[in-house]
Amino acid sequence: LTGEVQIGKTRWLESLVTELADCGVSCVGVLAPGQWVPSEGEHADANGFEKLGIDNVLLPSGERIPFARRGDLARADGPFDEESRAAKAELAWHIDDAAIDRVNAHFDEITAHASAAAPVGAKPHSERSAEGAESKDPSRAPGLLIVDELGRLEIWRGGGLTSAMA
């Protein structure tokens, strides 16, 4: 899913995760909802809201991790780390290295679980037929991996959520 900044990609994904759960389809991965407050300041959007930061919500557990804070706010509040990966990449957002590590560990857990659940000799998804789609075997149950979002740190710097791209 791609699109311009602030057009509702994460809100759409949140709705999709809910709809799929209602249909019995599990979603794993990460959602990245913004931390928004009403504002009339210079950083307010056209709807009168200001984005202060970004959380990461780990799926399926729903664990919420404070992930990123707008750089100017992080500098003013004090948690900005000049040695962090995000600072070295000169991003507009301050992302705590521990938060990156936690989300990467989550994707590593997803990969390990998927590898353990795959039957020996299983064909890649692209080579499977629809046969067995109704199987009660959890390793064959439908599911969706959500990675919200990949940005400059991942795509141009080879950092950030590297486990999501593995």
Regions found by a protein language model. Give the residues of each.
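Hydrophobic anchor at the beta1->P-loop junction of P-loop NTPases
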Residues: 1
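The conserved Walker
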Residues: 5
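Conserved lysine of the Walker
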Residues: 9
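N-terminal phosphate/diphosphate-binding loop that engages ATP/GTP or pyrophosphate donors
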Residues: 14-86
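Catalytic-core regions built around general acid/base machinery
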Residues: 16, 162-166
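Intrinsic disorder/low-complexity segments
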Residues: 44, 112-141
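Phosphate-binding/switch loop-helix module in NTP-utilizing enzymes
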Residues: 76-114, 142-156, 165
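Conserved TIR/SEFIR loop-to-helix hotspot centered on a Trp-containing motif
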Residues: 159
